[in-house]
A protein has these predicted regions:
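Structured-RNA-binding interfaces characteristic of tRNA pseudouridine synthases
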Residues: 1-159
Length: 159
């Protein structure tokens, strides 16, 4: 009776997909982010792990957005590669506006050496959006899973 789809959610997982190839795939147009420059996947993975844990994520939100708190817990930030397709899954107890796209942009920066993956916690601590990577385009961002507490959540997660 007090259930709301947004308010009752205890955690969510978003997936961001990057097609890392110099040649665009017409079948993926408007469905993924095309990124033609080669990415160092090992650095990308290390950067993702640096976001895990409880942090103040003000440095990876849209400038000018207001929330009660910018502290969130990222349960995992994992990258997988299948040929040219890179999928980045980010699961957290909540998200700020454009947070996933900015996290991925920061991971991409780390992938080609603009920042060091190990410096990401210090960059987050500055709360300065200008020090982290760009907000990636919306193509490629998908809400993948949501978790709810109690009976409703159990039924939803079994689907």
């Amino acid at each position: 009776e007090d259930f709301t789809a947004i308010g009752s959610c205890i955690q969510k997982e978003y997936v961001y997909q990057i097609y890392n190839s110099r040649i665009r795939d017409a079948f993926l147009e408007h469905r993924v982010c095309f990124y033609p420059q080669p990415l160092d996947f090992a650095r990308l993975e290390r950067a993702g792990r640096a976001f895990e844990g409880t942090h103040d994520f003000a440095a990876v939100r849209s400038v000018g957005t207001e929330t009660r708190t910018t502290v969130r817990t990222v349960h995992w930030c994992r990258a997988e590669r299948d040929g040219a397709m890179i999928s980045i899954a980010v699961c957290a107890d909540g998200f700020l506006y454009n947070m996933v796209r900015a996290i991925v942009g920061t991971m991409v920066y780390a992938s080609y050496g603009k920042i060091e993956p190990e410096d990401i916690p210090a960059l987050l601590a500055t709360r300065d959006r200008r020090l982290t990577g760009p907000t990636m385009p919306p193509q490629g961002l998908y809400l993948n899973r949501v978790w709810y507490d109690g009976v409703v959540g159990d039924m939803m997660n079994q689907a």
